[in-house]
Amino acid sequence: MSDAAEAPREATGENGETEMKEEEEPNPNYKEVEDPQQESKDDTIAWRESQEEERKTGEEEGEEEGKEDKKIVMEETEEKAGEVQEKEASGIQEETTVEPQEVTASMIRLETQITDSQSITSGIFPKTQRGSKSKLSLQLEDAETDELLRDLSTQIEFLDLDQISPEEQQISSPERQPSGELEEKTDRMPQDELGQERRDLEPENREEGQERRVSDIQSKAGISRESLVSSTTEDILFQKDKSTPVYPLTMTWSFGWNSSLPVYYIREERQRVLLYVCAHTAIIYNVFRNNQYHLQGHANIISCLCVSEDRRWIATADKGPDCLVIIWDSFTGIPVHTIFDSCPEGNGIMAMAMTHDAKYLATISDAEVQKVCIWKWTLAVETPACTLELPTEYGVQNYVTFNPTNNKELVSNSKTRAIYYAWYEERDTLAHSAPLLTEKTFNKLVGKFSQSIFHLNLTQILSATMEGKLVVWDIHRPPSSASTFLGFPYIKPCKLVHLQKEGITVLTTIDSYIVTGDIKGNIKFYDHTLSIVNWYSHLKLGAIRTLSFSKTPATPPTEKSNYPPDCTLKGDLFVLRNFIIGTSDAAVYHLTTDGTKLEKLFVEPKDAICAISCHPYQPLIAIGSICGMIKVWNYENKQYLFSRVFEKGLGVQSLTYNPEGALLGAGFTEGTVYILDAMSLENESPEPFKYSRTSVTHISFSHDSQYMATADRSFTVAVYMLVVRNGQRVWEYLARLRSHRKSIRSLLFGVYLDSNEPRLLSLGTDRLLIEYDLLRSYKDHLEVLDIHHTDQGCYPTCMVWYPPLTRELFLLICNSGYKVKLFNATTKMCRKTLLGPAYGSPIEQTQVLPVRSMAELQKRYLVFINRDKVGLQILPVDGNPHKTSAIVCHPNGVAGMAVSYDGCYAFTAGGHDRSVVQWKITLSVLEAAVSLGGEDLTPFYGLLSGGREGKFYRELEDYFYYSQLRSQGIDTMETRKVSEHICLSELPFVMRAIGFYPSEEKIDDIFNEIKFGEYVDTGKLIDKINLPDFLKVYLNHKPPFGNTMSGIHKSFEVLGYTNSKGKKAIRREDFLRLLVTKGEHMTEEEMLDCFASLFGLNPEGWKSEPATCSVKGSEICLEEELPDEITAEIFATEILGLTISEDSGQDGQ
């Protein structure tokens, strides 16, 4: 574990394996093409013109010119290939020994010499020498290039990776192929002759030909043979160009950190750089520059991370479905290798460690039966070198580390068992030893293990316990023998050392010291005999979570040095490296040992963050945590301004600035409401309001700041108002009302347009939209103005005022069925139902993006969050799937959202991941996606099975036009009137014919939507609909994922009872009674007619053609047709006639 061990310039690892090299050389021939795509386009035009000229000059002249060019190409290819081969032959000999600082395997091979933005926006073109004849060519359809690509891909698979430069892999993509002089020669001959000539040029020796062609192309294009990873320096990470974003939402900053994971000190010399984790992102933070670089790639919360001894390589792993292990280059921020399916049986990675030379990675899975794997990640392999399943009686192993001097030895521990591992690579065996310790072992209480390390003497292992003790294990290694195998090594408990009273939380080594950190914030240093050398107990820290020492050795003491003396009899100076301290209360400190200077780098919330709010006209964001802390940041310059920590038991649940930005309303978990001064966080009112017994989830201010309303978990709305008392304006409690039966999802103030008076509305999961009459309310009485039901089956999730894009004022309400509904703000009539963003879960919160100028008033956008994503939606909503975009922001759940006053940034709070993420909004990218998605009905055809030419759309057309015949009479002899429209009365029948069965309420909503669609503008009602509009109505109203078996099961869970087989069922009598008495109940005649059709006694659509009627509903005997007991499966298959898919349980027809 020693941080002092510097990798030598050249060193060969164990078993003859080469280690990685530290030297980096900048590439002198590295210039940027300003517009490679334009140059490529010009080259393409020139090539085509030359082709036309060649055809006009005649075939004979072309043949002669082709022969001359063939000779030139052959001579130049042979000359340059010979030179390159000589250089490569000598270079290979020089590069057989590689050091830990240089990437091996997939890392060097996967990276190209480009910036992040170019890799996305420019098709990953390599950079070429400006001013030379080398250009980017898009003409790669010739036989030679195709063959070269095939040859290279084959060669990369079978050759040693150190013998292939990253540029050779660049050529494997046609878009990356540089042409240089080769392109100029192709311009002067017909393409068929060129292809034949290049086939003639193919060398007989395949390998020599590949090397020769690759080297020739590289030399002509001016491509460096070094990748960005291998040629970079430590300073490049924070010098990357900030190019135009290519995503609508781009992470720019992350507030907070996961204090349950370590923080690493990865650089110190000229810049103090830390590594820590926020949610699913690893953060490289430059303290001096106040910059962050985000390592994004995980879809789940990062569960563990580790770094190499030289701090060059970072490994991160996550927990969850499709978990990943990613190795990063800390100099460039590039992911150099990814391990997929590292634990397919489990739920992710529990613990992870990297060897000091960064060759090997050890992981322990988070599964019921844990698996230890060792990965040779530098070889880009997809499977571990060895694996070991651990018995469950060993407990959950949550910590692992390698022997710093032997890559083949590891130690891990759970709370009750420490395990020693010995890796026999030649045997593909991971031997282990895990003696059981009990109180009888030492006749003393041992305590629960926290961390284990290898002793400095390398013959022992130390395990720290939460009782302040160290268990010393002796390692018994059998003597080495070349002829016979003498058994595996094992460990035995040697002694129990009671070091201190406080529980030890961190155990590590540095230089010649053994270091401990404990629950009281003490840091102690011991020598190899476990005699104390020095300690820091006066720092007043929380429980130590992590200690990370600088990779730079301590400077030797001078006359100006102020190192403290150690506690030995000699009293020598205690010379130690600087180090980073992370504590369990989410604080990070830097300790400069020369002079013992402790600097607080940051203190973040140590508990869930649920409340955030942006200032209405300044770049400020207030962040509230369940731990009782409110912090205010300037989010433009990323500067922490001020904070307040409330007394224990007060957790911040909700925050809102008032419209003037002078006040900050804060709701707490135990029901208290504070009104704070926005610039000092001091109490604005003498005493907080305590009118609720449960957590205050919502706070809202009226537009004139005369009213403040709150909602809590007991479904209660409370109103406070500003009054004048003794010449001073003070806040007073007005009234409260338990107006909902289920949780309140939104609390919203509005304005009456005719009087400019505030109006207050609340929305609950009980499907009630309630408006309150503030003017008629008085002390202890909150008057209700009206109550409206918003939906039938789905429940509402949030609401917001729809921006004035139309002459009609709307409330926008999202529901759990992925729908967005527009309600008239006055009548509360549902005026439109539209398909909203469907990204795995419904929208939970939404806000209208503020405009930045008056010119943007007619182009508005929504920002929304669902369970784990943040997204944008272009208004007006019309069901076009291309008008929305989303990105994962907090995999374990989003707790809150805020938008900056200028609409440039969105902020998301991650709840229990203790982080807030700032997202830069780039609307032009989203608009570009819409334009690429097509116009008119093109985006909507993609929502149909088979699209515009599919079977489903053809059936829809047939039913649409058949409904015209039906409305005119099936048996009529009059001349048919063919039209592009059908009357509205036919719409429900066509809907049902294509598999969508809307309720009567939904049918009324559809009729209102169509009838009044143009009423505000024209004053006319619409009584017909054409096919394109019908298609949009159908797609916007139908369930986005169809009818599923799980939905039927949920209904039977509510209505049924558990039968003798353990399934939910409904008795036949109850089933029939429910159909005629509950919900939108049928008449008995309607029910019998439906059963007649379902049982095949009458053909489908028989009422449209009365002549086909054979059986009346009254003639059916339901006792004979229906079973006594109906389960969900019987209802779906035997009654409705549906088929159930085997895998997902979804209905098919």
Curated annotation (Swiss-Prot):
Keywords: Cell projection, Cilium, Cytoplasm, Cytoskeleton, Flagellum, Repeat, WD repeat. Its main location: cytoplasm. It comes from the Eukaryota. Residues 16-26 have a biased composition (Acidic residues). One of its GO terms (cellular component) is axoneme. Residues 1-138, 161-219 are annotated as: Disordered. GO terms for biological process: cilium movement; flagellated sperm motility. Residues 112-122, 166-176 have a biased composition (Polar residues). It is found in: Cytoplasm, Cytoskeleton, Cilium axoneme; Cell projection, Cilium, Flagellum. Residues 1-12, 31-59, 67-89, 182-215 have a biased composition (Basic and acidic residues). Isoform 1 is highly expressed in testis and, at lower levels, in lung. Very low levels are detected in kidney and brain. In testis, expressed in spermatozoa (at protein level). Isoform 2 is not detected in testis, lung, kidney, nor in brain. Transmembrane segments: none annotated. WD repeats lie at residues 335-377, 385-425, 436-475, 493-528, 531-591, 595-635, 641-678, 688-724, 731-774, 785-825, 831-877, 883-921, 959-999, 1019-1059. Residues 93-104 have a biased composition (Low complexity). PROSITE patterns: WD_REPEATS_REGION (PS50294). InterPro entries: EF-hand-dom_pair (IPR011992), Quinoprotein_ADH-like_sf (IPR011047), WD40/YVTN_repeat-like_dom_sf (IPR015943), WD40_repeat_dom_sf (IPR036322), WD40_rpt (IPR001680), WD_repeat_EMAP (IPR050630). It is linked to Spermatogenic failure 33: An autosomal recessive infertility disorder caused by spermatogenesis defects that result in multiple abnormalities of sperm flagellum, including short, bent, curled, thick, or absent flagella. Involved in spermatozoa motility. May also regulate cilium motility through its role in the assembly of the axonemal radial spokes. This is Cilia- and flagella-associated protein 251. The lineage of its organism: Eukaryota, Metazoa, Chordata, Craniata, Vertebrata.
